[in-house]
Amino acid sequence: MAMSEQPQPVAGAAASTTKARTSFGILGAISLSHLLNDMIQSLILAIYPLLQSEFSLTFMQIGMITLTFQLASSLLQPVVGYWTDKYPMPWSLPIGMCFTLSGLVLLALALVGTGSSVFHPESSRVARMASGGRHGLAQSIFQVGGNFGSSLGPLLAAVIIAPYGKGNVAWFVLAALLAIVVLAQISRWYSAQHRMNKGKPKATIINPLPRNKVVLAVSILLILIFSKYFYMASISSYYTFYLMQKFGLSIQNAQLHLFAFLFAVAAGTVIGGPVGDKIGRKYVIWGSILGVAPFTLILPYASLHWTGVLTVIIGFILASAFSAILVYAQELLPGRIGMVSGLFFGFAFGMGGLGAAVLGLIADHTSIELVYKICAFLPLLGMLTIFLPDNRHKD
């Protein structure tokens, strides 16, 4: 159902005739902070096999660990985003990272989730502020840091944690401290930008589509996020167990396969935003979610070699969707950048946590292989993209 309406950016009465420049230094810094934040979180996922063997955990219990910190982040992110839309808080970035640091020291995963709930909406806002109008590119730079950080977790677990014990997780407090320093510098820039814009007349918010169409479009985007992150939960939480049980791999070798998948996710993120800027976000979303379906359907029946190849392809294609989905949603709801970012990051985290818990329950009562056979059909929900308003906007 192609529609001529398209999301447009905010229109203002006092629009500047000079095009803003992209602040690549700020984008690089916020991407580095995202890398450090998500590396810490992925490290928790990566040591699951060690925790399972030491504490005799079931898959359901492992899923509940994921749900604990993901749910804390999921519930708080939209609230944080909504509040900071009304009352910008530049210094919330390093403060949020302090929660993550505390959670790592105390092994309190809910605190790690709380820190993430503050970090993601405000960091996404900073990326948009620094974009110079190249919103897809800016979101991709921001996202690739997080995805590359996520890929480092299994690698570091294989090299440092598995051989020398889980007590070495404490060393990664240094990563949180570095992130706090970087975020403090970003907060200074954010504060300066806020002061510069304070005296300027506020732009008039023009909603690009009727309310009912916006609600429909956002609902479809959230369903697509559900399909993406439920599937991602099957890989991030249980891929190592799948490889160990089906193919007899060691923990270290299984972690290296997980690293390859997550590295492909990071690479795919780079593509989604800039391509969406050029050809339209809807087409990137369509190709990313639905386009991965043939590979997910084949995966449960593949040999070890082809399992590695297919998961890399799946990670690369699937990852290109999120930047396009987020910017598309921000264009649907101009003036609500923080709330939209919080809603979509929070929903993504929530679906990841819920997916881990539900899939863990299925694995306990059936088998880990059945989990991948069920999840293989999730990308078919990408067919709903046809009902999105046709977005021909190019930055």
Where are the regions a protein language model picked out?
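Flexible cytoplasmic inter-helical loops of multi-pass small-molecule transporters
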Residues: Q185-P208, D395
